[in-house]
Amino acid sequence: MEGGRAPACTTQVSFVCQRCSQPLKLDTSFKILDRLTIQELTAPPLTAAPARPGDAQEESALSEEAFTEGRQDGVSRRFIPPARMMSTESANSFTLIGEASDGGTMENLSRRLKVTGDLFDIMSGQTDVDHPLCEECTDTLLDQLDTQLNITENECQNYKRCLEILEKMNEDDKEKLQTELKELALEEEQLIQELEDVEKNRKIVAEDFERVRAEAERLEQEEAQYQKEYCEFKRQQLELDDELKSVENQMRYAQMQLDKLKKTNVFNATFHIWHSGQFGTINNFRLGRLPSVPVEWNEINAAWGQTVLLLHALANKMGLKFQRYRLVPYGNHSYLESLTDKSKELPLYCSGGLRFFWDNKFDHAMVAFLDCVQQFKEEVEKGETRFCLPYRMDVEKGKIEDTGGSGGSYSIKTQFNSEEQWTKALKFMLTNLKWGLAWVSSQFYNK
């Protein structure tokens, strides 16, 4: 009855290619396989050696056994390997449709699938290729087999030619070949021995190479270290060379300065005596005063300080010690000290004003200084009789005479004297000191 039927079930089953794993649609000839066709497909490949009678029976029995249906309670049970079949919803798969009560139709389809799967298993077991294959993979496989077949045929032809050559040989040729074979065997042994020796030598050479390589690495490291040290020493050398050149230049410059200083007259460089108009000057300080040119007393005092310092230096250079007075150079406040009266100081500086006209210490100091210049002249004349100053000095009167010129005498004092005559007397005194300076320089610095 229709009411007693179970609902229909649908199962889609398809085979897949064992190379590209694409689903396959089997040919319709797989549905009409008879026993004879199955035996032909499952028969083992033909061999050159005759087969034993029992082998054919065993193979037939195996074939029969492989396709024997396992029936139990009227139901055929067979597991379809997932590697060859898969359930899909594809349109290329075939569909098993049946009812639970219609056991005959399902049994036939299951049997057919079992036979097909077993057939593919047998084909895969007899060859090196897994089945089933799609058309494209089959064409590719056939091309590979054709290539292998061509290679095998060529090898077979070569073997046939070698066999024909061997069959044509006589006994002498065989003996000759045997002898040659023995010689080749001996040569092979020798070559093997040589190869062993070469291998031993190779090992020795490899060990030597490793040792030499290690030594080379060590030498490279030492070379790098030496190069580093060399660069450091080179840098130090360059620095020392620069320093040496600098020192040499400094020495050269110092030597030039020394030579220049040796040629330089200290007195001439230190005390520059010249004139500026009616004034005598020492180191650019004017010594004297005119009504038209009222020189500041600070400048006059500074000029007297330089004059005292000059005469003091000349006396020390000659080893002269003055009598009656001692020169005390003290800048613009220089003075003379009386040796007979230690408490008596004769200042060679003045501030001007009314006190200047009534205080005669300044005049006494200038006369005392003129006395010291006269002592210097007399000391020089002791060793140099030809020495003579341009202007004669009269210490008692405190005057300087212009013997080579006008023949007049000029007082070095300020009291009861005009500024013009006082200034001229100071100018003549500086001229005498300039001559004394020149003589000392010629005696002590130009030798």
UniProtKB/Swiss-Prot annotation:
The source's superkingdom equals Eukaryota
Q: Where are the transmembrane segments?
A: none
Alphabetical UniProt keywords = Antiviral defense, Autophagy, Cell cycle, Cell division, Coiled coil, Cytoplasm, Cytoplasmic vesicle, Endoplasmic reticulum, Endosome, Golgi apparatus, Membrane, Mitochondrion
State the coiled-coil residue ranges: 139-266
Q: Where is this region: Evolutionary conserved domain (ECD)?
A: 242-447
Is Membrane tagged as a keyword?
yes
Region entry Required for membrane-association, spans? 422-447
One GO molecular-function entry? phosphatidylinositol 3-kinase binding
UniProt's post-translational modification comment states: May be proteolytically processed by caspases; the C-terminal fragment(s) may induce apoptosis.
Name the Gene Ontology biological process terms: autophagosome assembly; cell division; cellular response to nitrogen starvation; defense response to virus; early endosome to late endosome transport; late endosome to vacuole transport; mitophagy; positive regulation of autophagy
Q: Which GO terms describe its cellular component?
A: autophagosome; endoplasmic reticulum membrane; endosome membrane; Golgi apparatus; mitochondrial membrane; phagophore assembly site; phosphatidylinositol 3-kinase complex, class III, type I; phosphatidylinositol 3-kinase complex, class III, type II
Region of interest (Disordered), ranges: 44-71
Annotated localization:
Cytoplasm; Golgi apparatus, trans-Golgi network membrane; Endosome membrane; Endoplasmic reticulum membrane
Query: Major location, coarse class?
Result: cytoplasm
- One Pfam family here: APG6
Motif location (BH3)?
105-124
Q: Where is the composition biased (Low complexity)?
A: 44-53
Keyword Cell division assigned: yes
> How does this chain sit within the bilayer?
Peripheral membrane protein
Role of this protein: Plays a central role in autophagy. Acts as core subunit of different PI3K complex forms that mediate formation of phosphatidylinositol 3-phosphate and are believed to play a role in multiple membrane trafficking pathways such as initiation of autophagosomes, maturation of autophagosomes and endocytosis. Involved in regulation of degradative endocytic trafficking and required for the abscission step in cytokinesis, probably in the context of PI3KC3-C2.
**Which family does the similarity line name?**
Belongs to the beclin family.
Name of the protein in question:
Beclin-1
Please give the organism: Gallus gallus
